[in-house]
């Protein structure tokens, strides 16, 4: 009787929004003035600045910044920050949702790295997987796959098997896994380790094909729901008070957690292969 109260509901929101008269397909206009911003650095290209300036004219924008190393990217500049109100921009979040780095510090003396180099190289060759189609022969039962979220959203249900298959893999591009020396220049009470040198595992990767397909789907959905002038089309957003906005936000967070789970699996396999115990992890 009152679809408005269900508009942002994860299960019934899509039906409610279909029942409501909607103006979501009307082309949105950019503001004449930019939202407040700050630029940190002197050698940032005009292209990167222009990308931020366009984003700052979105009706949802409340502020932005460019970091000293900012440069032009896909949509938003790399090293750019954009704050928006009650909305999310799928293309701004990016195609590799949750891409991150993860460092594990082990209790193995760092001298072992050079003394048994072949052992560590062999562990990397046998227990890491790179490329679009590489995967492990065995898969760990991770708690993330027990989450109800996979059954609540159709695209997540469809992608679950892919996510399981790609668990613990790194993909391609600039992603990597390596052993190396970690030096703490002072005692670090936050991670509970004293000053010294340690053996570490460092990895860089994201949410694999699982996150990429989520991103591609909702980028298309946002473009349909939020038409924008040509120069700003990549900034199409989803309102977080709507079903679609909530749906993407939920899927995005699951993809981020999946990326973290992949790092955990990669490090677990390597620690099991070389021995030792985990002393600290930074992600």
At which residue positions do the language-model features occur?
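Glycine-rich, flexible loop motifs
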Residues: 5-63, 87, 91-92, 97-191, ...
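Gly/lys/ser-thr-rich phosphate-binding loops in alpha/beta enzymes
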Residues: 76, 88-90, 208
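Short, low-complexity S/T/E/D/G/P-rich linear segments that nucleate or cap local secondary structure
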Residues: 1-2
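Short acidic, Gly/Ser-rich segments with clustered Asp/Glu that frequently serve as metal-coordination loops
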Residues: 72-73, 100, 206-211
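Short glycine-rich or small-residue beta-strand-to-loop segments that form or flank ligand, phosphate
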Residues: 65-66, 200-204
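Short, flexible loop/turn elements at secondary-structure junctions
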Residues: 43, 69-71, 180-183, 205-207
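Active-site nucleophile and cofactor-binding loops and adjacent substrate-binding regions
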Residues: 67-73, 94-95
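Glycine-rich loop at the start of a catalytic domain that most often binds anionic cofactors/ligands
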Residues: 77-85
């Amino acid at each position: 009787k009152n679809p408005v109260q269900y508009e942002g509901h994860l299960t019934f929101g899509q039906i409610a929004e279909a029942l409501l008269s909607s103006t979501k397909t009307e082309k949105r206009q950019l503001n004449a003035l930019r939202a407040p911003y700050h630029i940190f650095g002197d050698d940032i290209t005009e292209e990167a600045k222009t990308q931020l300036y366009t984003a700052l004219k979105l009706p949802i924008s409340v502020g932005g910044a460019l970091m000293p190393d900012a440069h032009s990217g896909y949509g938003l500049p790399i090293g750019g920050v954009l704050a928006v109100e009650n909305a999310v921009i799928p293309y701004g979040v990016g195609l590799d949702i949750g891409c991150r780095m993860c460092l594990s510090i082990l209790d193995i003396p760092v001298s072992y790295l050079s003394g048994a180099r072949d052992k560590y190289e062999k562990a990397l060759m046998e227990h890491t997987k790179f490329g679009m189609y590489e995967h492990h022969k065995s898969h760990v039962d991770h708690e993330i796959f027990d989450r109800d979220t996979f059954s609540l959203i159709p695209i997540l249900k469809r992608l679950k098997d892919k996510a399981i298959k790609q668990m613990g893999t790194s993909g391609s591009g600039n992603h990597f896994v390596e052993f190396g020396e970690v030096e703490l220049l002072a005692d670090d009470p936050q991670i509970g380790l004293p000053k010294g040198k340690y053996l570490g595992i460092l990895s860089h990767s994201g949410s694999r094909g699982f996150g990429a397909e989520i991103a591609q789907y909702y980028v298309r959905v946002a473009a349909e729901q939020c038409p924008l002038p040509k120069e700003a089309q990549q900034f199409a957003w989803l309102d977080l008070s709507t079903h679609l906005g909530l749906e993407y936000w939920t899927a995005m967070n699951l993809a981020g957690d999946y990326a973290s789970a992949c790092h955990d699996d990669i490090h677990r396999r390597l620690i099991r292969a070389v021995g030792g115990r985990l002393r600290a992890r930074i992600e």
